[in-house]
Amino acid sequence: MGCQEAFRTTLLEPFSLKKDEAAKVKSFKDSVSYIEEALGVYFTEVEKQWKLFNTEKSWSPVGLEDAKLPKEAYRFKLTWILKRIFKLRCLQVFLYYFLIVYTSGNVDLISRFLFPVVMFFIMTRDFQNMGMIVLSVKMEHKMQFLSTIINEQESGANGWDEIAKKMNRYLFEKKVWNNEEFFYDGLDCEWFFSCFFYRLLSLKKTMWFASLNVELWPYVKEAQSVVTSL
């Protein structure tokens, strides 16, 4: 665990979740004033990063007019999901052992039943789901996502589709994802924002599967205000 992550998990999140001054004093005692001073410095730096990131360092995709969402390439979302799970190398192994097990006369019924189940779980180890990505994504990538939502000009379903295209390109270029198919469509992108950003802000409760993104709360609120008009 890095220094910043330790600061976030031991001070920033626990302190920010306290409802009032009495609760803070009860938990942190005489350290409250020092923690508040440290958080003030930290939030000032975050604000500087956001302003710089959202203006001078603003990322703009090239050739996005030719980009397609996975929903345009796959007939069903299930096909897209299965492609992630059944990678070519995994599928070859699965078919090879499937052939051995089911053509052998010495294999009992239980083994034949358990084999596909075990192989499925082995293959799904490589499947990077949304929740795990949120845990590993850098703060700058989260800022880019929120900035993309805030600055989107399109409205309605088209707006979310455009955001999904831009983020698919961005996550691929930054090597966060191995292709431009992270988001299936605009609805997938909207769900991602709702689940891992706005919902956590509303609950203000620590979740095992994602960071609370306390530093980003002001920008999440701004993005949500834009979302209501999309």
UniProtKB/Swiss-Prot annotation:
Superkingdom, taxonomy of origin: Eukaryota
Membrane spanning residue stretches: 93-115
UniProt keyword list: Membrane, Transmembrane, Transmembrane helix
Major localisation: membrane
Compartment(s) of residence: Membrane
Claim: Transmembrane helix is one of the keywords in the record: yes
Topology with respect to the bilayer: Single-pass membrane protein
Keyword flag Membrane: yes
GO-annotated cellular components: membrane
Protein family (similarity comment): Belongs to the DUP/COS family.
Name the record gives this protein: Putative uncharacterized protein YIR043C
Organism: Saccharomyces cerevisiae (strain ATCC 204508 / S288c) (Baker's yeast)
